[in-house]
């Protein structure tokens, strides 16, 4: 009795919709010290699991059977999958094998800080990091250093260990995060409709998150300058605010490192710079970085030689000391970067809601943002187009829409011309599409977004001439109007990315508003032509007895 049938035990879990709700926590000084100890234990445990898993991965890849499995052609997927699965099972490289490893490593003092379920979640996190290396999506893993620390811990369920408990209205309607012997009260604003909607849904599990504050004197921060929040994974769909409407059109997007083209089938087209409101103060950040370097050198002179060069570190080398001034400067720099990231996230949310308000079906090309990071590192690091697509994917899924990312190799939207059907590669410097068949000139990004808007995701994704003949008659005027609006913004002085195909507004202005410099005067002296060093002056009219004025030369004036 009590044994479930094999079919029922191996049935996969049903995936239900999940959304997050974040609540700040009120943490006392003693509780904060215990939380730091728990997170430090989690850091060391995660590093131990990661180190053991990395050893298993090296042994598995050194086995000759690994090379034999790689030699199996991809046209035989079942044989290839079976060979790799046998290797993973032999060397214990799977998520459940890592859970068994976590059971072995969770001994001594670690068991006082981490229960079995939390240890399994950390083991799963380590396995996913190593599995990215195994499948070729990453090159190395990062161990959690003492300086970085572990910023979050989560549970698998909400009935034991780290859990969130909500009191009934008769008991005060308060929320508590319970972990070991600590009960951390959560700040709940019941007047907020988002919070009220979220707490009406069942809690799947809770996640404790530690975030740095601007200083120890910041509101809600402990003496180490850190805040604690709880993230609740709730079953259901998030609240849709009335101000965030959902349209019914189909929208085509063309995303670039610094710009985005939005072309719906019915509404007006747009060509916008991505996160144009972001204004990072690079000069202030560089000054903070130089100050941190000076403070680091002053506190650690033994780590530098007589010429100021860092010494090579070996085993047993002394640790780097961090002065209080260095930590304060680091917090100031982190606060600047945190505010910039929050502003970027807010701008992403505004743009996503504007797009979703036009249409619930969005079509764009599937891009490789890692390649953009290599070529346009500064622009991608500032505007984060990959985070924009991830934000859009979550928002569209929560509103019941569809985000379709079409492959670039089959569609070739930036090279295709719907007038003649020719596919002509263009260099990146060519920002206009103009074909001898009569299509164009039209801005390249707008034209690619137009082609994406009229793709049929349910059918063949290869664009054809027939499907664009009728839409082009009404879309050409909308694309030209969108580009004219961009030109007006450039004339007003806004600096726009060069990828929009418009010269920078500063290039149209003269370098100086003063009068043009006059040409040098040349004099003939002793048979040689010499430049006159004095600045030429206008002729002076001297009245004479006669009615005709007499011009005086500059030499005569002096």
Question: What is the meaning of each model-derived region?
Answer:
Residues 49, 121-129, 133, 446-456:
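Stable alpha-helical structural segments in soluble proteins, enriched in small hydrophobic residues
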Residues 71-221, 382:
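Acidic carboxylate diad motif detector
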Residues 16-20, 27-29, 109-113, 126, ...:
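Nucleic-acid-interacting cores, centered on viral/eukaryotic replication and modification enzymes
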Residues 226-558:
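Positively charged, helix-rich recognition surfaces that bind polyanionic ligands
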Residues 9-13, 212-220, 235-242:
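Catalytic micro-motifs at enzyme active sites that drive phosphoryl/nucleotidyl and oxygen chemistry
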Residues 2-118, 557:
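Gly/serine-rich nucleotide phosphate-binding loop at the start of the catalytic core
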Residues 51, 62, 137-146, 302-308, ...:
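Short coil/turn segments at secondary-structure boundaries
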Residues 19-25, 184-196, 272-276:
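Generic detection of short hydrophobic beta-strand segments and adjacent strand-loop junctions
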């Amino acid at each position: 009795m009590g044994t479930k049938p094999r079919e029922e035990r191996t049935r996969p879990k049903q995936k239900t919709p999940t959304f997050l709700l974040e609540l700040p926590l009120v943490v006392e000084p003693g509780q904060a010290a215990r939380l730091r100890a728990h997170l430090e234990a989690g850091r060391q445990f995660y590093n131990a699991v990661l180190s053991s898993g990395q050893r298993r991965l090296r042994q598995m890849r050194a086995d000759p059977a690994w090379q034999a499995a790689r030699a199996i052609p991809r046209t035989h997927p079942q044989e290839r999958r079976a060979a790799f699965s046998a290797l993973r099972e032999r060397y214990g490289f799977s998520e459940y094998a890592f859970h068994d490893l976590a059971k072995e490593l969770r001994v001594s003092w670690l068991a006082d800080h981490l229960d079995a379920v939390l240890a399994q979640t950390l083991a799963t996190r380590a396995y996913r990091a190593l599995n990215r290396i195994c499948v070729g999506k990453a090159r190395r893993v990062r161990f959690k250093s003492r300086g970085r620390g572990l910023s979050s811990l989560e549970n698998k369920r909400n009935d034991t260990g780290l859990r969130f408990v909500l009191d009934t209205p008769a008991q005060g309607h308060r929320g508590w995060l319970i972990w070991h012997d600590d009960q951390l009260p959560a700040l709940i604003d019941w007047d907020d409709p988002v919070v009220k909607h979220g707490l009406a849904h069942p809690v799947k599990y809770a996640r404790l998150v530690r975030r740095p504050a601007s200083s120890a004197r910041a509101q809600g921060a402990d003496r180490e300058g850190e805040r604690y929040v709880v993230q609740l994974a709730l079953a259901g769909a998030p609240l849709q605010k009335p101000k965030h409407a959902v349209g019914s059109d189909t929208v085509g997007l063309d995303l670039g490192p610094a710009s985005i083209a939005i072309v719906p089938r019915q509404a007006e087209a747009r060509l916008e710079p991505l996160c144009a409101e972001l204004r990072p103060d690079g000069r202030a950040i560089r000054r903070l970085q130089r100050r941190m370097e000076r403070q680091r050198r002053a506190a650690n002179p033994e780590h530098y030689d007589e010429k100021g060069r860092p010494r090579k570190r070996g085993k047993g080398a002394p640790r780097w000391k961090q002065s209080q001034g260095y930590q304060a400067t680091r917090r100031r720099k982190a606060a600047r970067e945190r505010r910039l990231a929050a502003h970027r996230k807010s701008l992403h949310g505004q743009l996503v809601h504007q797009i979703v308000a036009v249409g619930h079906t969005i079509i764009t090309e599937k891009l490789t943002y890692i390649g953009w990071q290599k070529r346009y590192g500064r622009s991608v690091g500032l505007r984060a187009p990959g985070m924009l697509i991830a934000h859009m994917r979550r928002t569209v899924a929560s509103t019941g829409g569809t985000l379709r990312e079409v492959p670039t190799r089959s569609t070739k939207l930036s090279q295709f011309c719907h007038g003649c059907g020719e596919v002509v590669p263009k260099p990146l410097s060519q920002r206009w599409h103009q074909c001898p068949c009569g299509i164009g000139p039209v801005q390249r990004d707008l034209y690619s977004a137009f082609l994406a808007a009229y793709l049929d995701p349910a059918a063949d994704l290869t664009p054809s001439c027939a499907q664009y003949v009728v839409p082009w008659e009404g879309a050409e005027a909308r694309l030209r109007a969108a580009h004219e609006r961009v030109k007006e913004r450039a004339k007003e002085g806004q600096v726009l990315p060069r990828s929009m195909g418009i010269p920078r507004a500063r290039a149209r202005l003269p370098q100086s508003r003063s009068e043009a410099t006059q040409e040098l005067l040349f004099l003939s002296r002793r048979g040689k032509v010499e430049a006159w060093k004095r600045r030429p002056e206008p002729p002076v009219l001297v009245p004479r007895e006669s009615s005709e004025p007499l011009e005086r030369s500059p030499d005569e004036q002096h």
